[in-house]
């Protein structure tokens, strides 16, 4: 199973993600703010980061840019999550280097499909 870092400030979404990831056997942990997220990504080198775009202290877009600027993190997958699921937002996230984009609220089956796509055999 995969090692996943969840960066999400909304408790109800974080709880749903915890339920899904635990049930599917993934190792995961949560950060509620962007502060320290990049350091955690560098230190733990997760397989995937589930990253909220609208964090209270830093934009998820900035974190994606920082991850993609570090060659040592090229294999870390990033799935952006946002309540603003417009085509413009999706294009922006993907252009900055995100591997996927999912609009909140999402169905668990939709998230599972994205996890399978991004993680391949580790899902």
Language-model segments: residues:
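Acidic, metal-coordinating helix/loop segments flanking the phosphotransfer/catalytic sites
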Residues: 30-48
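Two-component/phosphorelay signaling modules centered on CheY-like receiver
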Residues: 11-29, 118
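Conserved acidic carboxylate
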Residues: 8
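Alpha4 helix (beta4-alpha4-beta5 surface) of REC/receiver domains from two-component response regulators
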Residues: 18, 62, 85-100, 113
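C-terminal output helix
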Residues: 106-116
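The feature encodes the CheY-like receiver
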Residues: 56, 74, 86
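Acidic catalytic/metal-coordinating carboxylates
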Residues: 33, 59-65
């Amino acid at each position: 199973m995969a090692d996943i870092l969840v960066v999400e400030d909304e408790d109800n979404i974080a709880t749903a993600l915890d339920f899904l990831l635990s049930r599917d056997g993934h190792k995961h942990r949560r950060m509620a703010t962007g502060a320290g997220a990049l350091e955690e990504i560098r230190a733990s080198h997760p397989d995937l980061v589930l990253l909220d775009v609208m964090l209270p202290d830093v934009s998820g877009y900035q974190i994606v840019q920082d991850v993609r600027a570090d060659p040592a993190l090229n294999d870390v997958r990033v799935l952006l999550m946002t309540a603003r699921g417009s085509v413009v937002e999706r294009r922006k996230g993907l252009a900055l280097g995100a591997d996927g984009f999912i609009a909140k609220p999402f169905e668990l089956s939709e998230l599972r499909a994205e996890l399978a796509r991004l993680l391949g055999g580790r899902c």
